[in-house]
C-alpha cells in the first residue's frame, strides 16, 4: 500500500493549567489529535489519535508538542506508545525525556 504524505498540514496547540491538546488539520479537516498533561516541569504525552493513517499525522503531532516542550523548557514523558516509538526514532531528543519509573 502506498502512503501519501501531506506536507501542508497545520497544527494548533490549546493549553490549560493542567494540560491540553494538539490538533492537526489538513485544510479545514481535523485529521489528528494529541492529548497531554502537565506535572510541574514535565509534559506527559498521554494519547495520540490519527484520524487519517499513512500521511504523517502522528509524527506531525508529536513533533509539534516536542517543539512546544523545548520552547517552554519542559521535560517530556511519552506515556502514549506512539510517542515512545517516535522518541526512539529521534534519539537527538533523548535528553528531554523522563521515565515513569
Which residue ranges define each predicted feature?
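A short, internal acetyl-CoA/4′-phosphopantetheine-binding micro-motif in the GNAT/acyltransferase core
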Residues: 47-54
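Conserved acetyl-CoA-binding loop-helix of GNAT-fold acetyltransferases
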Residues: 55-67
Amino acid at each position: 500500500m502506498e502512503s501519501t504524505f501531506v506536507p501542508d498540514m497545520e497544527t494548533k496547540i490549546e493549553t490549560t493549567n493542567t494540560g491540553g491538546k494538539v490538533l492537526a488539520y489538513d485544510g479545514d479537516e481535523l485529521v489528528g489529535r494529541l492529548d497531554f498533561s502537565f506535572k510541574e516541569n514535565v509534559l506527559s504525552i498521554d494519547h495520540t489519535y490519527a484520524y487519517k493513517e499513512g500521511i504523517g499525522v502522528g509524527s506531525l503531532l508529536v513533533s509539534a508538542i516536542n517543539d512546544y516542550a523545548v520552547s517552554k523548557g519542559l521535560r517530556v514523558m511519552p506515556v502514549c506508545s506512539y510517542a515512545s516509538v517516535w522518541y526512539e526514532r529521534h534519539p537527538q531528543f533523548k535528553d528531554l525525556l523522563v521515565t515513569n519509573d
